[in-house]
């Protein structure tokens, strides 16, 4: 899992590339929390356009990010979600809790 971060006007964007599975989830959570704690954004955008596969570990990542952003009074948006991860989010109900673009 490759992760790149950019921040602009209290919006943090994390661009994800590769497989979001149990191998990459821990590193992604650590990086996301580090970036959130550094930039203190009001919005976190997870750009998933580069995600080629996602299992239930991706749900844990999104929920952890959502929890941290709620502590800061902010929100999470999932952007450019490919078909396979979207099916996982829809089946889990995450799509009802987190905005998807």
Language-model features: where?
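Short hydrophobic/aromatic patches at helix-to-coil boundaries
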Residues: 2-4, 97-101
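Amphipathic alpha-helical interaction surfaces in cytosolic regulatory modules
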Residues: 19-98
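Conserved catalytic submotifs in the C-terminal HATPase_c
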Residues: 8-9, 49, 101
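Short beta-strand/loop segment at the start of cytosolic alpha/beta domains
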Residues: 1-15
């Amino acid at each position: 899992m490759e992760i790149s971060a950019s921040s602009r006007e209290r919006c943090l964007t994390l661009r994800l590339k590769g497989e979001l599975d149990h191998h990459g989830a821990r590193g992604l959570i650590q990086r996301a929390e580090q970036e959130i704690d550094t930039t203190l954004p009001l919005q976190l955008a997870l750009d998933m356009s580069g995600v080629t596969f996602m299992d239930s570990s991706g749900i844990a990542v999104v929920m952890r990010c959502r929890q941290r952003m709620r502590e800061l009074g902010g929100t999470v948006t999932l952007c450019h979600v490919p078909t396979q991860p979207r099916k996982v989010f829809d089946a889990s109900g995450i799509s009802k809790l987190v905005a998807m673009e």
